[in-house]
Amino acid sequence: MFERRDDLRLSRKELLKVAEVDEQFLAGLEDAKVISSSRSGHFTTDDLALVKTARELADFGFHAAAFRVFRNAADREADLVRQALSGRRDSDEVGAELAALTARLHGLLLKSSLRD
């Protein structure tokens, strides 16, 4: 899940078609900093997965402001992972494992909060 997968390069037009979203929806995700294109204007496999997931959440009433909350939370978690990896010689090997552990913790905490 946390290995870098840039095997797909989609243009904006291709992303809109494959993800089955309109320009306004995609622009909202970009404004919320959920996704951004590369310097060449292309999108990756992960971008496609993010757009599709956001579209599914939108079907339940989530909107761009909510997606920004998710982005901010993910950025804070990423900062914690980077801090833990700072100065480690094995950071490349440990990084994916540490990210997976924090994702599991996040999921379990969310489950606990929804149960309470």
Feature names for model-found ranges:
Residues 1-116:
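Arg/Lys-rich, alpha-helical DNA-contact motif
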